[in-house]
Amino acid sequence: AIEKAVDALEPDLILCHHLYLLTAMARERFKEQKIYGFCHNTDLRQMKKTGLWRDYIREQIRGLDAIFVPQSAQKEGVMEIFGIGAGKIRILGMGYSQEIFCGPEKPDNAARGKDGAIRLIYAGKIAEKKGVKSLIKSLSYLPYPRDGLKLSLAGGAGNKTEYQEIEELALKAPYPVEFLGKLPQPELAKEYQRSDIFVLPSFFDGLPLTVIEAIACGDKVVVTDLPGIQDWLKEQAPGAVVKYVPLPVMRNTDEAVSESLPAFEKQLAAKIEECAREEGQRRVDLSHLSWKNICKEILKSS
């Protein structure tokens, strides 16, 4: 399929997402083509955890003409895992759809409800490693009356058994938990606009695009203190209301040590409560992170 596309389009530049097997195969097959690779952090996790063709992938990725990473933590990871010099790696950030993810036309309208309840939202895979179980458990540490808070979970199931366990946890939660399923982007944007706080308690992530989308829609944010995320958000989204939760004790890159989770969940609840006391999210200019501007940055390197 790739060969057919290259033969038909005769591209000047090939963009390959994910520094893993398919990108490595493209580099080997199209030796004369200029190829840029894009790191999404999960590729670094795969290289650490999986031995599948690791040496082959490492060799071919080194041959890419340029590599783009979300932020400095991934740059360091690419240098370490692939043995690539800093000069070939460019920090790009993340692009989001500015036309879809934006504040409501009337910020003071009923989009966020008039019942006085604090609306929390999570978006992503409904999975334990994304911290969803811990998010639901953290609700038990919050001080509000039952009708004072609501949690919405947007996203599809990763593992069916795990999803069922999360559903069972939600039934026991002290506040209503709504499963929205996997939403098209315009619908997800509306849910952000109806919410007050976006919570991402993920145990492993690069630069989560959902954080940017939520800020663009006017949400305050509670997120785990992922490597490099504080510095990046302070630079790219100055003034945004963001609270950071220290990660639990980790092993094997993305697995939380179970004994450390109760303390993590208490800290998560404390940050949600702290965030709720803050005034509403300030308008933050994220136009420099639009796909149009991201594309301009990529083409500058060609």
Regions found by a protein language model. Give the residues of each.
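Acidic anion/phosphate-binding donor-loop and adjacent secondary structure
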Residues: M47-G51, M79, Y96-A117
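Conserved donor-binding/catalytic core segment of Leloir-type glycosyltransferases
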Residues: R112-K130, I136-L139, S152
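A charged, aromatic-enriched C-terminal amphipathic alpha-helix characteristic of glycosyltransferases
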Residues: A256-S302
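Aromatic "clamp/platform" in nucleotide-sugar-dependent glycosyltransferases that forms part
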Residues: F203
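Short alpha-helical donor nucleotide-sugar binding micro-motif in glycosyltransferases
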Residues: K182-L183, K190-S195
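Short hydrophobic beta-strand element within catalytic cores of glycosyltransferases
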Residues: K220-V223, Q230, K234, A240-V241
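Nucleotide-activated donor-binding/catalytic signature segment of Leloir-type glycosyltransferases, i.e.
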Residues: Y163-P186
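Carbohydrate-associated surface elements
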Residues: A73, G95
